[in-house]
A protein has these predicted regions:
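Conserved N-terminal phosphate-binding loop of PLP-dependent enzymes in the Aspartate aminotransferase
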Residues: 1-207
């Protein structure tokens, strides 16, 4: 109830054990709700060590003027290459590339996952207009916007970075400051989306 009062987007809240688990659950939830499998990541974001999040773009060898997507490569060995086709990546704060990617892949995306302040990349921050554009494009293409606030939640502001940016995501993940050392994390979001966690819907739990 306290989280819901502080974060307007947190209409319903569920708990997990770690930030990684929260993001895994958020992505699974988005796929279950939309019926789509692909997803969009912002290059440089860290969302935990699970297979779906362990991809990066080879931007150094990529020509942004081409019609081709940047090459997607895994963080390391042990990640099934069959998952590669589901992950799409865009550079942070490149509004044109974001729009182009949605035009090309938007109707197959379940979610866009963004860490607005990238904790593992020297705190590179998303511009407000970039995140607001992401919100608009997600609405236009029926894609769920997931804001990863595992590190920023209740640290940068009472309502998280989303409150500062003035953007309301469909799903949010919190950890770190939520537990202050205890193993706890949060998946929160729109009520209609969150109710997809149900028997016969998306699975959620843990030990």
């Amino acid at each position: 109830e306290r989280i819901a009062k502080m974060v307007p987007a947190a209409e319903l809240v569920r708990f997990s054990n770690s930030g990684t688990e929260a993001v895994m659950s958020a992505l699974r939830l988005a796929r279950a709700y939309t019926g789509r499998d692909s997803y969009l990541l912002v290059e440089g974001g860290y969302h935990g060590l699970f297979d779906a999040a362990m991809w990066m773009a080879n931007l150094e060898d990529w020509n942004p003027r081409s019609n081709n997507d940047p090459e997607v490569v895994s963080y390391g060995k042990g990640i099934p290459m069959t998952l590669k086709q589901l992950a799409h990546l865009v550079p942070m704060n490149d509004s044109q590339r974001l729009e182009d990617t949605f035009k090309k892949h938007g109707h197959s995306l379940a979610a866009m996952l963004i860490e607005p302040i990238q904790g593992n990349c020297c705190a590179i921050s998303a511009r407000q207009d970039y995140v607001q554009l992401a919100r608009r494009l997600c609405d236009e293409y029926g894609v769920l916007l997931i804001i990863d606030e595992v590190k920023t939640g209740f640290r940068v502001g009472k309502g998280g970075i989303q409150g500062i940016l003035g953007v309301r995501p469909d799903i949010t993940t919190f950890a770190k400051a939520v537990g202050n050392g205890y193993p706890i994390s949060v998946v929160a979001g729109r009520e209609d989306v969150m109710r997809t966690f149900r028997p016969g819907g998306a699975a959620h739990g843990g030990t």
